[in-house]
């Protein structure tokens, strides 16, 4: 029982160390990938920018007013 508890505590400590350093390790890996691909390859990485069009045309406003009457 004592051995299992000791192994559990060592595993918890090692997991905490991994979680604390994970951001640094993954950040360095991501920087390496970005430098390999270059800025041009990562320029349009987020495709959701096209879906959020903040400009509403007059026809859009008219349709919204009709819908919410």
UniProtKB/Swiss-Prot annotation:
Family: Belongs to the non-disulfide-bridged peptide (NDBP) superfamily. Short antimicrobial peptide (group 4) family.
Tissue: Expressed by the venom gland.
Recorded superkingdom: Eukaryota
Job description of the protein: Amphipathic peptide with antimicrobial activity. Shows antifungal activity with MIC values ranging from 25 to 200 uM. Does not show antifungal activity against Candida glabrata (ATCC90030) and Candida parapsilosis (ATCC22019) (MIC>400 uM).
GO BP annotations, alphabetical order: defense response to fungus; killing of cells of another organism
Cell location: Secreted; Target cell membrane
Propeptide feature ranges: 41-69
GO cellular component: extracellular region; membrane; other organism cell membrane
Entry keyword set: Amidation, Antimicrobial, Cleavage on pair of basic residues, Fungicide, Membrane, Secreted, Signal, Target cell membrane, Target membrane
Signal peptide positions (record): 1-23
Modified residues (Isoleucine amide): 37
Main subcellular location: secreted
Name recorded for this polypeptide: Amphipathic peptide OcyC2
Transmembrane spans: none
């Amino acid at each position: 029982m004592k051995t299992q508890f000791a192994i559990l505590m060592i595993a918890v400590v090692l997991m905490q160390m991994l979680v604390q350093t994970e951001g640094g390790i993954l950040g360095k890996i991501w920087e390496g990938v970005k430098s390999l691909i270059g800025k041009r390859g990562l320029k349009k990485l987020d495709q959701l920018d096209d879906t959020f069009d903040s400009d509403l045309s007059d026809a859009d406003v008219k349709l919204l007013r009709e819908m919410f009457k």
